[in-house]
Each structure stands twice: as structure tokens, then as C-alpha cells.
Amino acid sequence: MLKLKQYRDTAVGLPDLLNYALKPDEGIVQGKDGSLMASWYFRGEDMGSSTAQELAQLSARLNHALVQLGSGWMIHVDAIRQYARSYPPLCPFPDRTTLVIDAERRVQYEQEAAHLESVYAMTLTYLPPKAAETKIAGWIYSGKKNDTQGMAGRILNNYKNALMDFESAISGVLKGRRMLTTEHTDGLIGHPTWGATYTLDEQLRFFNYCITGEDRPVRLPAVPMYLDALIGNQPLLTGIEPQVGDKHIAVIALDGYPQESWPGMLGALDTLSITYRWNTRFIFLDGHEAKAIMNKHRKKWQQKQRGLKDQIFKTSTGAVDLDALQQTNDVESAMSEVESGVLKFGYHTANIIVMHDDPVVLKEQAQKVRKAILELGFGARIETINAVEAWLGSLPGHSQYNVRRPLLHTLNLSDMLPITSVWAGNEFNPCPFYPEQSPPLTYTATTGHTPFRLSLHVGDVGHTLMLGKTGGGKSTALAFLAAQHFRYPDAQVFSFDKGYSGFVLCNAAGGAYYDIAGEHSELAFCPLAQIDTKEEQSWAVEWVETLLVLQGATITPNNRSLIFDAVQRLSHSSVRTLTEFVSQIQDVGMRSALNYYTVAGPLGHLLDAEKDGLK
């Protein structure tokens, strides 16, 4: 008889350790323990130039949003440091000068150290109460019995309503986008809409990255179940130095906190020059649960205030342990804050997960992260025996692994979360008039090995103000931006400079440079040459009025009528010089004022030409 025992292995694999079961609704994953998870990508403001008061206000607003959560709720916040997109591909620069400028910048960018940027994600998990507790609550509270959804449907609807409330509360602090699914088509050559349709899931893609360190699209099955096997299909080697697939894992734990917190206290981690995932987990507790835990600590410290003799005989002659007295007061103060509803307490766990194919490089990077944490005043250690459990606890939706028991309140949590970020700019130019997915205007650099993708546009508006001291390089910067603008197809630049600051670039790039009113310039204008339409005629009337005002004349309704009549007559003439226009004016005072701009005056060589000198 054939023995099949060796083929029926009961050993635990990676999918068995994951808590992901199915997707009951759009953007929601249900865990094996019955929990529900929803995730967002978010980004805080770049507060590099903000004051301490502004940062404190930001933390307070986030705390106000978090105190709405209680027992059964858990939040995972991940700050993912990853390599930035490389320099844009070759663009159709129309001349050698601007092409060489961009080529030199490309070489410089590629020769610099690694360029990284941060992506921020948040997962909100809710574990419903046990069925027995729900049934008891149904006995206590009476009301209309109209349960057509069942317990699972009620829990799901309540969770979705809670998500909307949470999004509304946190929208004033963080700009977020829910992780959802998108529909795609395989497509055929020449027929992109033909072929089989499939669904890509952003949330599962994010979960897969947290597990394997690989950022790849994840297709959602037609029956969205057994998600643990879908995204946990890599071999896991446990031990002191765990490994998932080809990537070795190092977990750096924050196991000691400073005496006080301040907003953005871990912001320096956002500038490290290595890839990592900084995970913060917070398991919320209701007020009565937190007070029960605190009361145990209060009793312990009360017993330490006086010696055994004083406690037995109930005397107060012995020395008082001032440290125990202070600790008791701290606990009682925390209990009063819980009672007031200003803060919520919970279990906080923070880890930085580093993955790399080379274990030697991984150890160097882990030591670099540990050193950065120690310099911030925190305690840090590289996990060994506890590495696998710490890594599992950092995965979104996992609540049972690596729970740190000391309580922390939500205001401390707000100070330690990555709610501020270094702004790296839009990945593509946001102007709708450029081709789709056009690169940013230029690549520059900001703090912490982070590139800055500079685009002057916000939507279709590109208004920009540049301030700086005299000789600080403003004109050079403007000329550089003009040169970079030629990366877009059919680009044109019209520039007004001062002191010939744009002369070199204009001539080197094959442009036309006009020295208006210069000593050797022959450029002259014919401002009234295009007054064939009503819009141009209206503009001409306003422009002539401006010339009169500059000469100190007062514009009356009669003057305005005379100007309009003259413009009308000039529009039927083949000669549209200012001299011809002045001859159409019937008012002597107006003719005298306008002669200043004709060949009879000092500006006639500039404004009284028969045709525009611009090419």
C-alpha cells in the first residue's frame, strides 16, 4: 500500500500566517478573524518652513480625529521610502543648445547618489464584537426588529459608515485617496478595447508590497477569496535572519521613548538614503478599558510610596518614595484625561522594515537606520529572535503579533506619525495643454536625497513669482526655465528681459532677439495694424486712452467718442500708422498729446511704423 503521509504535510506556510481572507465590498478586505480593513494613500503638507506652533496645531487636529476610535479599532500607518522615477527620457529639444543643457543635467542626476521619495499609506481595521456580545446587546436594547441584512450585513454597513465619518474627520489634516479597484482590458493590437476584462486591486497591491517588498499589480480573482494565497505566494524562511522569496528582512524596533513628544519628532527618517518601510501600529482602547489598566499601575506605585512597616501599621513616619509618588500622580493625571475624552489610549508598536537581496548590505542599512533612530533620542534595536513576529505585526490588519503593552495616548501618536512630508513635486506636468503624461518642467533637488520635480503650472495656470536679492541669479534661473520648456513639442517662449539677461540663450538657441528702443535697433511697431475686428477696435480705444492719460489729458465721454470714430475710419484705411490716426482726430488738444508718439515726437521711431518689425 502506498504511503501518502509524506505528501500530506501539515507544516505552516506563509499564507497560513496571513490574516487576509476575502473582499466583501469595494475597497474592503475581510480578515480570517472577521476584521474589516480599508486603506488609503495619503500625504501631509510639507512643513519644512512651518513654526512649532503650526506643527503643534496639526498634531492636535489629528488627535481630535483619532479620539473618535475605540476598542475594536486599529490603525496601521506606513511610510515607504522607495527609489524615485529616473530622469525623463530624451525629449524633442529643437536645438543643440537646449539639448546639451538637458543632457548635462541628465548626466549629473545619474551620477549623484540614490534619489528616493516617500509614499504614505494608512490602513484602518475594525474587529467586530463577538456574536454573543452582540446578542446580549440585542436583549438589552429594544426597538423595531427589521433585520433583512443579517449580522454580517449590519457590521459591514456600520463599518462603511464609520469609514465615511473617519474620512470626514481626517480630511482637514491629511490629503488622502482610497485604495480601490480599476477595470482593465487585455486588448489586441490595433483594438485596445477588445479582449478579456480584468480587475486590478490597489489595496492588495499594497499588501503584497508590505509582504514581499515587490511592487507589482495584483489581479483580483472573479471570486475574491483566499487572498492569503494570492499575495502570500512566496517562501518564508524564519529564524534570526528571516527571508521572504529572495529578499532578506531586518526589523529595527523602537523600544524606548523620550520623556516628552513633539510634532514631527521622527521626521528625520523621511530623509534617509535607503529604501525601507516604517510601520506604526496603534490598537485603540475604550476609556474604561484604559482606566482599568491604569488603575493597576496606580495601585502598584501607591504601594511603593511607603515602606512595608508603614503599610502594616498604617503610619506615615517613614521616608516617602518621591519617584513612586510622582508616577502615581502621572497615572492619575492620565486617568483624568481619559475621563475628559480629550485623549484615547492604546498599544503602540513602531518598526522599520528593511529588505534587500544581499544580507551584507542589509546589515549595513539596518545599522544606519538604528543609528538615525538613536540620534533622535529613541531606543532602537535590530530584532533577532523576535524578527518574524515583529515583521508579521507590521503587516496591515495584523493585531495579534508583537503587541507592546505600555500604553500611549493619541496625542503622542500624532506627534510620532509621518503627517508631514518632503514634497517631491508632481510626477507629470499637470497642465492639460501639454501632451498626456508630459514630464515636469525640470528636475531639481530638495532635502534628504529627494528629487524635486518642478512644474510651474497648477492645472492650466502657470503664474509664478520669483523673489531674490540683486545679483542672486533670478535672471539666470528664468533663462534656465525657458531652456527647459523646449522639452515639450512645438514649444514657444516669449520673454522680456532686462540688461540683456536673455540675450546669450536666445542667440545660442536660434531665437530672435529684439533690443527695443536700443541704440542700434531698427525695430518699430504699428500698434493699430490689426484693428479689423470689434475686439481689436475696443482694445485700440483703450490703448489710445492710456496714451492720453500718460500725457496728462482727462478722458471725457466726448473724447472717447472721438477716439472710437477715428478708430472706425482708420479700420477702412490701408495705412494704419499713428500719424494717420492722429489726422483723423478732430480735437486739437488730443492731437497735440498724441503727436508725442508719432514721427513728430520723440517716440515716433518706435510706435509710428507702417508695419510691425517683429517676425
Predicted region positions:
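Hydrophobic anchor at the beta1->P-loop junction of P-loop NTPases
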Residues: M466
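Walker A/P-loop NTP-binding active-site region of P-loop NTPases
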Residues: G472-C526
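Extended, folded cores of ATP/NTP-driven motor/assembly subunits in large transport
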Residues: M1-S421
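The conserved Walker
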Residues: V458, T470
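Short coil/loop residues immediately preceding or within conserved phosphate-binding loops
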Residues: V461
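Conserved hydrophobic/aromatic pocket- or pore-lining residues that grip, position, or stack substrates
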Residues: I352, H449, D497
